[in-house]
């Protein structure tokens, strides 16, 4: 140990394969401590899983503190997004094939906080083009209860950049259609599904899924798990026309527990 106090920083993952370096990197110097990350369409493209990126810091450490052991408490920098579903009526059944989220920021830089108990900050440039990330595909999920939610992605959560989502303003003339929502970079869900009520098909058929679109807005927070329960009734066409009774949301935010990993470092 040197005589002066030291600042320690740790990052998880610490190293990545060469082909992943374009998506993830970190920097820790005297003046700059930041993480750059680009989310991948993990469940659509399927080429790579997203990293649960974490950091830890211990500043002003000396040899006399903790018997010369540096203790780290890792914190998540991304937001976790999970979906469930219910039906609006007890005699309704929904079969889900695909869910996608359109038009959210998927890349940015996270600057570490000045102190370990701080929260840090994200900066992301505005979207340059419309895009969609997959929640599930080829899902074959049946939802047939209006009281108990059916799990969709609790075990396969999305990891996304924290941000405020602007929902598709389908009621406004300037953004009535899906194309206009894309041009305005407004957020919505794309859902390929079949909807039946008392056995009769209201959307799709026994052999065909139909696609509906649902305005989607919220604020994703760093280190939080956001759970969305879709209450199925219907949605909108790509021209912004209502299909049946549009889907409602029941949103919940829970703590995504920090990793209490004590990593012992003895310089």
Task: State each model region's role.
Residues 83, 137-216:
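Extended serine/threonine-enriched, polar tracts that run as long, contiguous segments within proteins
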Residues 6, 14-17, 108, 119-127, ...:
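Surface-exposed, beta-sheet-biased, low-hydrophobicity segments with strongly acidic/polar composition
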Residues 7, 13, 118-120, 196-198, ...:
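Solvent-exposed loop/turn and edge beta-strand elements of beta-rich ligand-binding domains
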Residues 112-141, 211-217:
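Solvent-exposed serine/threonine-rich low-complexity stretches and specific carbohydrate-binding patches
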